[in-house]
Amino acid sequence: MQRTLVLLKPDCVQRRLIGDVLSRFEAKGLHIVAMKLLQVTPELSKQHYAEHVEKPFYPSLEEFITSAPVVAIALEGLEVIRVVRDMLGATNGLQAAPGTLRGDYSSSRQMNLVHASDSEESAQRELDLYFNADEFCDYSLVLTPFMRADDE
């Protein structure tokens, strides 16, 4: 099984969309294996967005991501990185297709509700930033046999 990091950004938290977003992931059959509410510090922001720190838009990104709590979630599932990114839609909410999270709930490029890892490497790096090894819960869902075939 593959794991990915999902961050419900300050706009998602402030707009009280946490439950709606989590419901969509759960309805898709994705498995929550860790979750916490936290305030991103400027230091954590710089670590998370290290590739953007020198870019002109970074100061506003840091200001936004540190402005209110976020919900960090570790999701597990088959091809979960691709599946989650498909569910999110285009980065810019104005360009995201209806039916995607951003298409349904966002109309902004920066305030686009959710961050998700874009590769296995970034997923591992980001999961390590937000969670300690002992914070992951490995458990079986009784519904798993009804979500996909054994050979998938």
UniProtKB/Swiss-Prot annotation:
Catalytic activity: a 2'-deoxyribonucleoside 5'-diphosphate + ATP = a 2'-deoxyribonucleoside 5'-triphosphate + ADP; a ribonucleoside 5'-diphosphate + ATP = a ribonucleoside 5'-triphosphate + ADP
EC number assigned by the record: 2.7.4.6
Matching Pfam families: NDK
Protein's recorded name: Nucleoside diphosphate kinase
Keyword Magnesium among UniProt keywords: yes
Originating species: Rhodopirellula baltica (strain DSM 10527 / NCIMB 13988 / SH1)
Gene that encodes the chain: ndk
Binding site for ATP: K9, F57, R85, T91, R102, N112
UniProt-listed SUPFAM superfamilies: Nucleoside diphosphate kinase, NDK
Positions of the catalytic residues: H115 (pros-phosphohistidine intermediate)
Annotated compartments: Cytoplasm
Keywords, in A-Z order: ATP-binding, Cytoplasm, Kinase, Magnesium, Metal-binding, Nucleotide metabolism, Nucleotide-binding, Phosphoprotein, Transferase
PANTHER family: NUCLEOSIDE DIPHOSPHATE KINASE
Similarity comment: family membership: Belongs to the NDK family.
Complexes and interactors: Homotetramer.
Keyword Metal-binding: yes
Function: Major role in the synthesis of nucleoside triphosphates other than ATP. The ATP gamma phosphate is transferred to the NDP beta phosphate via a ping-pong mechanism, using a phosphorylated active-site intermediate.
Cofactor(s), names only, from the UniProt record: Mg(2+)
GO biological process, one term: UTP biosynthetic process
